[in-house]
């Protein structure tokens, strides 16, 4: 590992953010700190992760949602101080890393199947 990677890992450890593991296709709720004048509030942004970019400290992900009939995409930096928290609402079962094809789809064709826990794991947890 080179010096830059070591520095990035130290910076990530210093930030001390708990980021859940999520993948493209998952529905997430991103709580964003919004500053309006002197007021600071938390705004929830819920949508489907259509892309994820793993670059250490520069990692990011794109979330797409439908707001009043119009598709809205927002790209977040994973370790940004503007992100208060990330919560995974549901896991999606997809076969692609980038789900840009969802931009052209609407309605039922834009649905993503839910990834159910495997029966082997469920049986092991129950036992």
Swiss-Prot record:
| Keywords for this protein | Ribonucleoprotein, Ribosomal protein
Recorded GO molecular functions are: structural constituent of ribosome
In the record, biological process GO terms are: translation
- Name the family the entry cites: Belongs to the bacterial ribosomal protein bL19 family.
Cellular component aspect of the GO annotation: cytosolic large ribosomal subunit
Q: What is this protein called?
A: Large ribosomal subunit protein bL19
The keyword Isomerase is annotated on this UniProt entry: no
Briefly, what is this protein's role? Answer: This protein is located at the 30S-50S ribosomal subunit interface and may play a role in the structure and function of the aminoacyl-tRNA binding site.
């Amino acid at each position: 590992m080179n010096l830059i990677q070591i520095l990035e890992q130290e910076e990530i450890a210093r930030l001390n953010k708990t980021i859940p593991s999520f993948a493209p296709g998952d529905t997430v709720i991103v709580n964003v700190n919004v500053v309006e004048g002197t007021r600071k509030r938390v705004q929830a942004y819920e949508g489907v992760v259509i892309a994820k970019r793993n670059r250490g400290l520069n990692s990011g992900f794109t979330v797409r949602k439908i707001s009043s009939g119009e598709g809205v995409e927002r790209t977040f930096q994973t370790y940004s101080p503007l992100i208060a928290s990330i919560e995974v609402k549901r896991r999606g079962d997809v076969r692609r890393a980038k789900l840009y094809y969802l931009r052209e789809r609407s309605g039922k064709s834009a649905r993503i199947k839910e990834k159910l826990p495997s029966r082997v794991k469920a049986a092991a947890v129950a036992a």
